[in-house]
Amino acid sequence: MSSRKVLPTKINLINLRRQIRLIRTIKRLLENKREVLLLYLRQYADEYEKVYNEVSKVLSDVYSTYLQGVASEGLSTIQTYADSIPSSLNVNTSIKVLFGVKIPVVDLDESTIQQQPFGNLEISPYILKSREQMSYAFKKILTLIEIESSIRALSGELRKTQRLINAIDTSILPFYQSSSKYIKSVLDDRTREEFTRLKMVRKLLQRRR
């Protein structure tokens, strides 16, 4: 939209200047929001790296212990044990709001973890240990999923915030500033013309006297 399409009146000039101040205030708020989002993202990124390393180590231990159990019991026996245990794990999901951004929360319902899934069966201690390790690893994996989803949500909000700032800098604010400048220029010209006309009228009146 051209700034010349705005009617050059004093009221419009006052309104434009007021809107320019408001736009600059909004931009400052968006810039503050961007800084806070970046801070949260850095924190989540650090936490993600920490938990990821923990998960990698735990899973490595799980596989190592599990393979020892397989070597001890035999793969077919382990498969029979696994098939005899019904699925019971339940994961609860919810949403929390962080600085206006919806963040997913994922929790394992620990009451759904079977305490003695193998009953009174004689089973390799390696399998029992790997199961305990996997239970811990699963909780960490859920934490990792939650952090990753949070990073994705915060990154999306950051991109949206940056687009708004860019729109203000490249389109909105320049339009209002050029419109204000155009109206001021027209009003100044009118003032000068009015002043010149008054001078001429005064001279004419003086001559008639």
Curated annotation (Swiss-Prot):
Its main location: membrane. GO terms for biological process: proton motive force-driven plasma membrane ATP synthesis. Coiled coil: none annotated. It is a peripheral membrane protein. Has multiple subunits with at least A(3), B(3), C, D, E, F, H, I and proteolipid K(x). Belongs to the V-ATPase D subunit family. This is A-type ATP synthase subunit D. It comes from Sulfolobus acidocaldarius (strain ATCC 33909 / DSM 639 / JCM 8929 / NBRC 15157 / NCIMB 11770).
